């Protein structure tokens, strides 16, 4: 990433953790520093990616879409996003704020779906070729609370319809990944919005200070 002039900041977490709100806050903080930004989401963010998203998230494909197919669709969408959107933005000095990235696949497919992490890592190496975020914020929320918050948004999609045990496995895997990768910043999202935003602001302001 050192050859690229922009920065990639990723927001991670379970459903209901407040990722969208966090993305908006980060954009606001960066704009105050006159930093040009774009936002992305996964899966999606490109024409092809949005088509793949509609397949992955569609409840009609419950018990139909094979876990392996889901994994490959996610990486297909991610490749398109990196090559069509993220890298071009970074190369012209824009900062990219992403709602989900690679960590989600490790947590959801590796943890939630119980897929072999070695297979996922091999696929990641092939598809991403070492491409990594400059900063990852993981919003940590209790799965039950997260689903209550997510339900308030409306009808559940295919992923959100999974069992609470599924989300507990994801939550546990996120914690393992954070311990294995100390550069990931974990923020307690069980707290009030004001407290969460204050923590995010502190992390982002320190990151800006060291990268401008």
UniProtKB/Swiss-Prot annotation:
Keywords: ATP-binding, Kinase, Nucleotide biosynthesis, Nucleotide-binding, Transferase. InterPro entries: P-loop_NTPase, Thymidylate_kin-like_dom, Thymidylate_kinase. GO terms for biological process: dTDP biosynthetic process; dTTP biosynthetic process; dUDP biosynthetic process. ATP binds at residues 13-20. Its EC number is 2.7.4.9. GO terms for cellular component: cytosol. It catalyses: dTMP + ATP = dTDP + ADP. The keyword Nucleotide-binding applies. GO terms for molecular function: ATP binding; dTMP kinase activity. Pfam families: Thymidylate_kin. Belongs to the thymidylate kinase family. Phosphorylation of dTMP to form dTDP in both de novo and salvage pathways of dTTP synthesis. This is Thymidylate kinase. It comes from Legionella pneumophila (strain Lens).
